[in-house]
Amino acid sequence: MPERTGLKILDMISRGAKVIDLEHDRFPGMPAFDPVKPAMEYFLYRQHENSYSTSQEKRRSSSSGLIVMTDQSGTHLDALCHQAYDMKMFDGTPINSDVETPWGFKKHDSAEIPPIIRKGVLVDCTELLGDPLPENHEVTLKEFQSVIKQEGVSFGKEDVILLRTGYGKYWNDFSKYRNAAGVSGEVSKFLSDKCYAVGADNLAWDVPGKVDSDSGVIQPGHLHLIAKSGIYIMENLFLEELAKTRTYEFLFIALPLKMRGTTGTPIRPVAIL
């Protein structure tokens, strides 16, 4: 009987394969794109101090918390309902009251996103443009292709592309992180039929607020990739440890939460080398 792929992965890990965490920690006040603030709040509504009593025979106590968080914060994946073009999603689904409700979306929400287990490709633009890239720089298609050539990598329609700007190291310094470099519209348009998902170590994949001269919109990557092509975007990835390995092709795993109706979901992405 052929050995199953999952067991092969376990064998790889037992033999020393590296598992690299690509998620940032989450906390109240963490960096967030302005329209989705506050990103997260957390409260302990049950505390050990209030439930403990010396009169109890076993003296067990409990504590529980409440998380209040936007679905577009932290290390996350955009669902395909997150963007539309002329009030239609990538597959022509119209945005109307049957699809978009006050309680969430009925189609292309986060609950529909499958586990992502695919080849990952790191495009580390810092090797060409400096670490980190200049503030608010938009990676051009020429620069993107130069990095790919320099790394010697290839990718196809079923693969995941992770682009590093070097700003992930500033996760705890929002004054720097908010000015991270991003990806130009021409790169996103180029990738719109060439991959399964993309991600970057910044707030929005794109550079927030910059108008794309070709499409006339801000965040052109969200237009070309999600709204027009049905390609997932991941944001706020932590790529620093992966970059240190100088490994540009790897097994990528990200598990979205099955949250009905939501426009995005937290993920715990890892790279297995």
Each model region followed by its residue ranges:
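Active-/binding-site microenvironments in catalytic and ligand-binding cores
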Residues: M1-L273
